[in-house]
Amino acid sequence: MEQFHGTTIVSVRRGDKVALGGDGQVTLGNIVMKGGARKVRRIYNNQVLVGFAGGTADAFSLLDRFEAKLEKHQGNLTRAAVELAKDWRTDRMLRRLEAMLITADATTTLVITGNGDVLDPEGGICAIGSGGAYAQAAARALVENTDLSPRDIVEKSLGIAGDMCIYTNHNRIIETIE
C-alpha cells in the first residue's frame, strides 16, 4: 500500500525572529487527497514550532514522541531533539518511520532525520520535503538580497516551491516566534 506523502516545510531565522511554514497538500501516490492539511504546529506552551514532512502517520507518531521529549526535558529543544533522534535510530519500530521534522524555538532551529541526525542549519535556513530544495534556494536568495522578514521570506519561498513542485500547493500555514 502506498503512503501519504509530499509537502514542503521551510524555516528562516533572521536576527531574533524565526518563521516556519508549510503547504497543505497530502498526496497518495499521484492523487491529491487533501489540500489543507496542517503540517506546522506550535507545541510546548506555544514556545516551540514544529513542521513535518514524509508519511503522515509516521510524522504524527514522531511529533507525539518529540512533544513527550520536550516535556521530559523542560523545553530544552536540543536535548529533546537528540533524545528523539537516538530513539529513532535505535528502536526497531521507529526506524521504519519515514518522516523528517524541523523544530524551532526562540534561539535554535534543528532538522531531525530518521537517520539519527540532528542538524543545525547553516545560515538559519532549512527546508524539507518534496519541494524543500526549491524553497531553500528561494529563501537563501531572499535572505542574501533583501531585508524581508523571516515570515515574508517563508511565504515567498513556499510560493516558489508550490509553482515548481507537483507535491506542494499554495495553501500555506506560517508560524513565527519573535
From Swiss-Prot:
The active site is at T7. CDD domains: protease_HslV. Its main location: cytoplasm. GO terms for biological process: proteolysis involved in protein catabolic process. It is found in: Cytoplasm. A double ring-shaped homohexamer of HslV is capped on each side by a ring-shaped HslU homohexamer. The assembly of the HslU/HslV complex is dependent on binding of ATP. This is ATP-dependent protease subunit HslV. The lineage of its organism: Bacteria, Pseudomonadati, Pseudomonadota, Betaproteobacteria, Burkholderiales.
